[in-house]
Amino acid sequence: MANIHIIGVTQSSDLIGEALHVMQHARAIIGSERQLDIVKPHLKAKHPAILKTLPKLVELKSLIDDLSIESINDQQSSIIVLASGDPLYYGIGRWFSTHFEPERLRFYPAISSIQMACHRLAISLQDVTVLSLHGRSLKTLRTKLKSAEMLLILTDKHSNPQALARECQDTGFEESLITVLENLSYPHERIRTFSVAQLLDDSEQLSFASLHVSLLEVKGAKGVERMLPEFPGIPDTAYITGSGGGKGMITKREVRLSILSLLQPSNEDVIWDIGAGCGGVAVELAYWNDKTTIYAIECHAERLEHLSANQQRFGVVQNLHIIKGHAPECLADLPEPNKIFIGGSSGNITELLDTVWPLLPKGGLLVVSAVLENTKKALNDFAQTVATINSKTRAEIEVVEVSVKRGQFTHTGLNYTPKLPVEVFKFKKA
């Protein structure tokens, strides 16, 4: 029987039915001062509950354990935790689900601020993308900025409307509109819509209540190429490499797309990118696969600087982790991968192959690109070893050669510049 009840409340919510009953017979009620003030009028004097201000999450479990009594079947032993709106929608509910057995928990949702915002604006919830920047890097917004998207955003002090406007301006979406919905359901509720320019021009004069959500209608000038991609195949020139014009240590677009198609990234993958350079493969992997975890390993100081700059530029700060060090020495402390890409080996390809191949599980993938002849020979030798039927770690092997010629129109007509062919090996552990 549940003895921890997580009840969603809003300023305008009516506590009725089972939620009201358990609250009126609870041993303790935990919530913010604002939430406790909302429920106090509903409590019965003959069943006084202990009222506790919600502590930090690191202290909450011990508080609940201290308040609990042995008999969870006694309704008087119930502990109430107050939550904002729907506890299981970007709320405290997930924390409870990971820290307590499900049979101890019961949830009572109220309308969430996201739902309320949609109703105020007459927008269907299924037509918006909900994003929480609360406690997250503002740069993660960049992975969601696409033309004609409507983003409903839960924010904190680092992602206020002015900060959202700056991100729109910096990424070429300066025609976007931002609607700020403050203090929803409170007497001093306020809804205002701003252009990006208005928010930036009047930045110091404009202030917003701490309780607010923002609707971002993403718009940019038509026909203008923007920094952030909307389809796989990020232009080489979009990366920061220190060389300009798409030059420098990045895997070029045509080869990069071949590598991504061979890696077949999916949710919950852990992928190592060894010799990540300026981040061509790692950044594109992370940008299109936000539930994939990528570790980009690089030892060269200047490339690391550009790799970090590209991580910020494309907003892949949550799922792309940069590791400074030499492989294979720096790999020991990383989470075990199920897929590995080697784009650079500093002449150490044989040792790398011998080190990383045993780490992969059955069905794991190793993808390696090769331009230099000695790298191609080492991969050929490795392929011969793992292709033998008697090999303990046999592999299914696929090899493609990507040859690219890029055309450019000059006064003499169309001229092609051939690029060095790249061999891409894929090994799947059988």
Task: Set out the residue ranges of the language-model regions.
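Class I S-adenosyl-L-methionine
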Residues: M1-R106, Q115, K291-I294, E298-H300, ...
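A contiguous loop/helix-start segment that scaffolds small-molecule binding in enzyme catalytic cores
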Residues: A2-H5, I16-E18, E59, M150-G248
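Class I SAM-dependent methyltransferase SAM-binding "motif I" and its flanking Rossmann-like core
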Residues: T10, G85-A148, P328, R394-N415
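Core SAM-dependent methyltransferase catalytic element
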Residues: S214-G220, K339, F409-A430
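Conserved class I S-adenosyl-L-methionine
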Residues: E268-G277
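Conserved SAM-binding loop of SAM-dependent methyltransferases across substrates and taxa
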Residues: C278-D290
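Conserved SAM-binding loop
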Residues: L307-S308
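C-terminal substrate-binding/active-site "lid" region of AdoMet-derived donor-dependent transferases
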Residues: V356-P421
